[in-house]
Amino acid sequence: MITKDKAKEIAKFITKPIEENLLNERIRLNAYYLDCIRLNKVNEQSILLESYHGVNFTGNAYALFRKLIESYPNFKCYIAIKDTEDPMIKWLKNEYKNKNFSVVEYESKKYLKLLATCKYLVNDTSYMPYFCKRKEQVYLNTWHGTPLKTLGKDVKNAGFNDHKNIQKNLFSADKLAMPNRFTAEKLIKSNDLDGILNAEIGMFGNARVDLTLNSNREAMLTKYNLVKDKKIVLFAPTWKENDSVDESVKQLIEQTDLIQKALGSDYHVYLKTHYFVYEQMLKMDYGNHMIPNWVDTNEILSTVDLLITDYSSIFFDYLPLKKPIHFFMPDKAEYEFERGMYLDLKTLPGKISNNIEELVENIQAKENEYLNKYKVYIDNYLELYCSQDNGNSVINTLKFMFNDASEEKLFKSSKKVVIFYGGGFYNNGITNSIINLSKVFNYD
């Protein structure tokens, strides 16, 4: 006979999934997405473009979009973004008002249907864990930067599966458009994909760097309302997650003011920082020194005369211009210890300043003398990491996406791939059995 408590337990077991489907919005949206896959055909003439999980629409996706909209009119482009009133979106609607594209709110039902039905999917980071690429779709991932900092499992103190969603995305991708061989190797190996990845990999430079090399400086100054009668300095420090916003704001204002004072009235210093810091600085009436989150950084770089950064990959994008780069790393030892670096900082194509006093002094060096001093380092980095950044990366990447011939396809494995699912891989007999079973395969 079933006891009362047992009956309640059985009832809960039966009703809990029903309650979750009715009340949990995430589960309902996931179910809707799967229904879209099941019930709809893939639209062969559609392209969905996404950048940085819909936070903005910039970088590689933005650069590719601008070429697609002009040169591939038979395709309908969809831009995924969280804020459909984003200033960049408004600019695009005005600039391309007669072109074949639409804007969709990120993770809305319309977005999920497009994710399920667009033939071409373009992303510079990753899709959410619920993403299931259909075999009829073509997923192009254009990773968002050459890494100075470690990635995936190479990050010091990283959790065992912290990189699981990036790994899944790269494994799902049909094509990876990489800026250089170094990035491809680090990205693939740090995400445990070496030897099992089946994606085609093309080395074409960063599509977004075309915007840095090919943009008209005066047009960009006007578009982003930047000063036109002074040299421009961009101060682009990395956001440190352990820092408080208030502390960061205070420190960055002090540092920016000191940089501006040192360079004098012939220069104007702009600060590009994290969204949280940006919002706080606007409240403090510091907007005349701020670059908003919505702007395309590579278009901004086309106007910049001197770059100050730290561990950000932005300096790789700026390097082809062969202008001065200064590295401001007051927390270098701590950052190397906690995060880890792929590159020897002694080889960087510019001077490292360990404190604001050193930076203020170093940025006053004469431009020609400074560039000559670091010429060997600059040329070495250009050869190793920027050799394909020649202003034609967008064209070559799109040819690659549309199945035109690619000269470089690396890491593509011809081996069969077997995936084991062992639940949580707990320390028990099931996990031990899977490990033992994995040893009987012929890996050659």
Question: Model features per residue range: what roles?
Answer:
Residues 2-112, 411-444:
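N-terminal pre-catalytic "stem/leader" segment of glycosyltransferase-like enzymes
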Residues 48-212:
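Active-site and donor-binding regions of nucleotide-sugar-utilizing enzymes
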Residues 162, 203, 284-286, 313-385:
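Catalytic binding pocket for nucleotide-activated donors in carbohydrate/polymer assembly enzymes
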